[in-house]
């Protein structure tokens, strides 16, 4: 079947649902697609279709990020349903890194929970520009005052992490009722999407910068070659252009992009913000891996040593309970992958306590494509214990 071309007439934004486990992120995602489908351009998605990663059926928790698309009158949205469970923060980091804005889902019956805070912090650290709040399960709360109290709590929490808590739109509703077709609650979903349209800024596309795409996944298509998938972080890539594969390995490798597709539709080019698959000429499946980037030749280089400003999570935020010292060896999570590195603290700083801000030097065991301003998380045993930004490349 010939693939149809992708329509670019509307502005495009990547958004996602974040929040504590079981507060209703996936139900809300299904409700948005279902309610918008009644208005035309969107294909309805059932809860099961979105909650479709294999592991989670056993545990009833969302593990992988699901991508769905829908449209409002103003925009075309690609929506990621971010995992909400602490064990799966790794995916949350990959997911949140793909957001021009987020919908923070908080159960009105429960109020903000530990992962609510963690996801707000992660959103701040991975540079999500704006959040809109959906107070879910409002049908289970009879007390108006309780709703107001929860809303105040959420606003305070957002302000604590440098989001404008007083200005953030808060929509009160019930995703489940909307999904069941209750007209009053369907309207709340439309109100939410209106808020997303109005409040989440049109993404400043980095289309004019040199091309770069972090590789999320790689697979082979028999007879066609190797495809790398990911979200274009900046620039444009046209079919026939040359790219470098950078990071993890000592040697970078050049190749030509022979095809680009998005949502199973073929494109002549892709630009910043697009989730794409890039077909690479003459590249074996094992030559590309998650954690590398595809980039315009010469535009970004692999490095192992850099200075960074780091915030170390406090114990209450789910961070370490004890201080760390020079020669601490955690994992540094860049874009899509963890790389072990050794920490060197500045002279006069003997140790770093949970909750501290610190400038440190890091030396990675494998080279990664980085530059000033590149963000990362610090993790140990799958748990986020800090986050930082590269301030100076050293080698």
Curated annotation (Swiss-Prot):
Transmembrane segments: none annotated. PROSITE patterns: G_TR_1 (PS00301), G_TR_2 (PS51722). Its EC number is 3.6.5.3. Belongs to the TRAFAC class translation factor GTPase superfamily. Classic translation factor GTPase family. EF-Tu/EF-1A subfamily. This is Elongation factor Tu. Mg(2+) binds at residue 26. HAMAP family: EF_Tu_B. Residues 174-176 are annotated as: G5. GO terms for cellular component: cytosol. It comes from Staphylococcus carnosus (strain TM300).
